[in-house]
Amino acid sequence: MPFFEEMEIGRRREIGSYTFTAESIKTFAAKFDPQRFHLDEEEGKNSLFGGLAASGWHVGSACMSLLVADGQRLAREAAERGEEVAVWGPSPGFRDLRWIRPVLAGDTVSYANVVIDKRTSASRPGWGILTARTTGTNQRGEEVYAITASAFVPLRVKGA
């Protein structure tokens, strides 16, 4: 993972894609969001969604899973090159979470993020706070998900 100083505003990353199957939608919903339009095709079809729809939390969880996997891959590649690996901290929060369009069974959502802000932390010496806008786009090119989230990122040069 990159250090704070290496992150540039405007940097865009393709994070990965996830296909929402009827089975994965129902399994997630049964555990975490058991509403009828997430659990039953007919109920979904008769709802405002027009089909079996993934929970918005499922759409966000798929994004988080891909973000973590991408970060692990970046860290592994940096370590293989003999580079120091930045271990990112937690997220202090998010804003502007939007479920823009329904994600239906069979949809594939591709996620990407863009760094929109960065600043050094006033309360945590040695850390910066990076803010990125992450979006999810379905196979038809329609944006279906968006969130603006921040993360603590270590500074390479402590005290900067």
Explain the meaning of each model-derived region.
Residues 95-97:
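Conserved interaction-surface patches within small, structured recognition/assembly domains
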Residues 1-92, 156-160:
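Hot-dog-fold acyl-thioester-processing enzymes
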Residues 1-14, 99-160:
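HotDog/MaoC-like acyl-thioester-processing domains
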